[in-house]
Amino acid sequence: MLFDLKDQEVLGVKDIGAQQKLSDYINLIKKWNKTRNLVSRQTSDQDLKEHLIDCLAINREIKTKKILDIGTGAGLPGIVIALTNPETKVTLLDSNRKKIAFLTHVKAKLNLKNAELRHTRIEDYDVSEEQLIVCRALSSPNELIKKIKKNINEQTVILMMVSEEQDIFIEGYKTQYINSVAEKILKKKRGFLRISDLKN
């Protein structure tokens, strides 16, 4: 079992089937990482479990049925969101062909009908009004907005997974730091930076 009963309650993953698929997903990462460099070679089993907890914690902040995970890499958090939210459409975007190949295998192996894969850069992808953007801290929030602001709209909300509060200095945008429930489990600083248009 991936999580004890207390952690299951905090993370909202009491369904045995979902837990099994999450476990299968982690095993696929470990297997493919030997040849594909999906995550750092130094990543331990405990590190992967912590990544999983971080990604599961974002579920509490999701209030839409369309999610866009940019720079998804090995599928964190997109695959985790898709596995635990079967009614939510999750688009996973990455410019690395090898990582998209891995995600294609994961989608088929775990029968993820609500996951859609896109081999492209965020600069070349137009975000729909309904999509919530999620991402790990690939870059600073300021660099991220500079990169994607031509492709988003006033309704776009971004949730960036971070370990500390960060400010944004681009005119027209605001941020809100949200504490993650993962802090209770990991005993480490964890949170989300909510980035949105000032009008939103």
Per-range role (PLM):
Residues 1-64, 68, 98-99, 105-115:
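Class I SAM-dependent transferase core
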Residues 70-72:
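Conserved beta-strand/loop positions that form the S-adenosyl-L-methionine
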Residues 74-87:
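Conserved SAM-binding loop of SAM-dependent methyltransferases across substrates and taxa
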Residues 88-91, 95-200:
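S-adenosylmethionine
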